[in-house]
Every structure is written in structure tokens, then in C-alpha cells.
Amino acid sequence: SAGGSTGGGAAGLAAGMFPLASGTDLGGSLRIPAAFCGVQGIRPTVGLVPAGPKKLPFQSLGVPGPMARCSHDLGVFLEVIAKPHHLDPLSPGFSFKFSEKRVRSVLRLAYIKDPAGIGIDKEVADKCLETFHALSQLGHKLDIIEVDLADGREAFEVLRAQSMVNAYLDYTEKLDEMGENISGNIKRGLGQNPKDIARAEITRGEQWKKLAETFNSYDALLTPTLPITPFPVENNYPESIDGKLTRSYIDWFSTTFV
């Protein structure tokens, strides 16, 4: 699998078909394929890259962003597309400027092995630790820390389902014509009540606060992008992670959305 949803963009970058690609990222749609294909993709801060006129201008889950083969190209591309836009109410009143100049020569970095609490396959965990030690040898200060974001999984599922209802409101009578993943999310969203959504938003705020507080001590947080390596393209999703059965379609990319 090339990952998704911007799997074509990531595969094309890796194959040398084009130098840049773009897409949107709600729960990992830029970062997942980038990780599977060995290129780079980021989910920018909400509003940094304007979406322009759209049906739901105030939604803050899915955001547009760039993909590239290296961090330099990614930064330059982001500078080009991250501009204010008067038809995007979440767009800030400034442009993003890319710079390769370091804020400080020695960075304070924290590694969170399993932020979603779903386990990490050994091959992925070993590679992450190799990178961790390589950064340490370059002189950066690194700590292994624990930040429990497992509650974010349920909150994301609720908010994602609601976002699907918002996006496909005019098509709720045609669910039988849709794929299982989309129709399943819409059905869940239609069955939720306001308390479900309120609890999810509260959890979202609590998770954000946990992460924000870590930046009092660290310049950046390091995590595995995904807990698994690419799986066969014929499979809709992996059946297990670190020897444990997955409970739903989105378990395997929990690390990108908690």
C-alpha cells in the first residue's frame, strides 16, 4: 500500500514523476502516504494554508498541505502556498516564511514511543530508536517521555463521523451507493447525540493542553508516524498491531490523529 488518501501523490514523488504534490490532511492523509513511500508530508497549522471558498469554511479538522521529497522542498513549497486569503475565515493575516536557520544549535527533543496506546510493531520501534540515538550523537538533548493520548482515539472517531455528516449531508439517502468506510462514518455520525460531540470536543481540548505543556520543556516532539510498515495493497487495513488485533479501520493510523 502507498497509504492514503494522497497515496498517488506520494507514490509519484517517490517514483520521480513530479517534484511536489499537495493534498489535505484530516487524520493523516498527507503524513501516512509520505511515511509509506519514503517522502515527506506535513499537516500545517489550521488556516496557515487557505482553502479558499468552500462549503464548510469554519471546519478545523481537515487542512490542505504540501508533500515533497525532502524537507527543503517541503519548506519552500509551504512558503508559496501559505498566504492570507480573504475568503478563508481561519486564514491568519500573515504569510509563512521558510528558513533553514536554526533557532538554536542544540535542540531539546522528546520521544513518545506510543502516543495512541495501540502498540508499535518492533521493526518500527527499532528504527525510531536508531534515529533517536543518531540525533543524540549529533549533540541534541533527548528524553523518552510518556504522554497518554489514548482518549483521543474515541474523540477523533466522533468528530470525524460528524465531519462526514457535515460534508455529505446532501447524500445521506444514498449511503448504499458509497464505500464501506465513508458510509460507515456517516452512519455513525447520524447516530450520535450532542453529548457525544461535546465530550469529544472537551477531550480534544484536554489532549491539546497536554501536548502544549510539553513545549515548556522541549523544542519538538518525536513520534512514529505510523505503528506499522506498509501492508499489502489488497488489504483494507492491517488486522493487528504489535500482535494485538485492531478494533476498527482507523486504529492503525491513530498515531497521526490523537
Pin down the residues of each PLM region.
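A short helix-breaking turn/cap at a secondary-structure junction
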Residues: 40-126
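Glycine-rich, small-residue loops and helix-cap segments
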Residues: 75, 81, 192-258
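Short connector loops at secondary-structure junctions
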Residues: 141-156, 186-188
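Short pre-catalytic strand/loop immediately N-terminal to key active-site residues, enriched for Gly-Thr
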Residues: 1-4, 62, 245-249
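Acyltransferase
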Residues: 122-146, 169-173, 197-218
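Active-site-proximal alpha-helical scaffold in enzymes
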Residues: 1-35, 67-68, 78
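Short helix-loop capping/hinge segments that flank enzyme active sites or metal/cofactor-binding pockets
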Residues: 103-112, 159-212, 224, 228, ...
